[in-house]
Amino acid sequence: MAASENNMEEINPVLRISQLDAIELNKALEQLIWSQFSSCFQGFKPGLLTRFEPEIKASLCLFLWRYTIYTKNATVGQTILNMQYKNDLAVTKKYRPLNKQQKVWFALFLVGGKWLEERSFDLFSNHPFGASFQRTKYFLNAISGLLKFGALLNFLIFLQQGKFATLTERLLGIRSVFSRPQDVRQVGFEYMNREILWHGFAEFLIFLLPLINTQKLKSKLFSWCKPAKSHGVSDPSLAVICKECCLCGEWPAMPHTIGCSHVFCYYCIKSNYMSDMYFTCPKCSSQVHNLQPLEFKIEISEVHTL
């Protein structure tokens, strides 16, 4: 079954975005491996790996190449996306894996090119006055510029034709194909619909909540939950009424009245009145006529009874 799938003719081309995603996944994997490897030497002397960093990175890339392209004809990113490399130099249209020469040259371009790019500065910095080294450095810089220009042209051609995402693939004659036939994908919009509903509901709440007077609503609920307590009118002192604020239920700080027989903290009544100009007493439903401080005398013995 696997042999028949590998030998079937290619029908569906690989998407450009899939090839670019595979390249990005490979770069992310290399960075992850290097970060994990360097974290193993955090307890050692600082700068221990800096001197040999290009060689260590090249060794790690060579290790990845050995167990991905050399054995499976596909990078890690291609394996995740159900892709692999095909020998495009073969005359037949059927799938042909990469030959050994293509794999070795791929390693030289991939690993050796990165190593030379990172190590070239150190190689020529120790011989700043040598004429031969200067010519070699100029020659390498010219080659590097030509390769970058060629990579740009190859990318533009890749966007048009959809083959050979990198210059290395075009030079070696290898391109990405699907490793297995693609099934018809069932596109579902459940997640998108749920996100749209939640975003719409959040925007509705952002528009609605500023229109609701929460302070007034809280006062109404407080008046319904705590009905008015009847106090004797014959009580000569206001000690019974003035022991607690009608809003917070605590001992009134800077007690004030609004014209009725009930007492409020200054902060409680002021904040409620500023948020609702039609504020009424939650116990007797009296409107605010005149906010004024309360002056009364209370015995110390009555305070200790609280």
UniProtKB/Swiss-Prot annotation:
Subcellular compartments: Peroxisome membrane
InterPro entries according to UniProt: PEX2/10, Pex_N, RING-HC_PEX2, Znf_RING, Znf_RING/FYVE/PHD, Znf_RING_CS
GO BP annotation list: pexophagy; protein import into peroxisome matrix, receptor recycling; protein ubiquitination; response to amino acid starvation
Zn finger residue spans: RING-type: 245-285
Superkingdom of origin organism: Eukaryota
EC category: transferase
Pfam name, any one: Pex2_Pex12
Stretches of the chain found on the membrane's Cytoplasmic side: 43-48, 126-134, 213-306
PROSITE patterns: ZF_RING_1, ZF_RING_2
Signal peptide: none
Peroxisomal matrix side: 1-15, 75-98, 162-188
Binding site for Zn(2+) 1: C245, C248, C265, C268
Bilayer topology term: Multi-pass membrane protein
Chain ranges passing through the membrane: 16-42, 49-74, 99-125, 135-161, 189-212
UniProt-listed Enzyme Commission number(s): 2.3.2.27, 2.3.2.36
Gene Ontology CC annotations of this record: peroxisomal membrane
Family, as annotated: Belongs to the pex2/pex10/pex12 family.
Functional description taken from the UniProt entry: E3 ubiquitin-protein ligase component of a retrotranslocation channel required for peroxisome organization by mediating export of the PEX5 receptor from peroxisomes to the cytosol, thereby promoting PEX5 recycling. The retrotranslocation channel is composed of PEX2, PEX10 and PEX12; each subunit contributing transmembrane segments that coassemble into an open channel that specifically allows the passage of PEX5 through the peroxisomal membrane. PEX2 also regulates peroxisome organization by acting as a E3 ubiquitin-protein ligase.
Record note on quaternary structure: Component of the PEX2-PEX10-PEX12 retrotranslocation channel.
Domain note: The three subunits of the retrotranslocation channel (PEX2, PEX10 and PEX12) coassemble in the membrane into a channel with an open 10 Angstrom pore. The RING-type zinc-fingers that catalyze PEX5 receptor ubiquitination are positioned above the pore on the cytosolic side of the complex.
Protein name: Peroxisome biogenesis factor 2
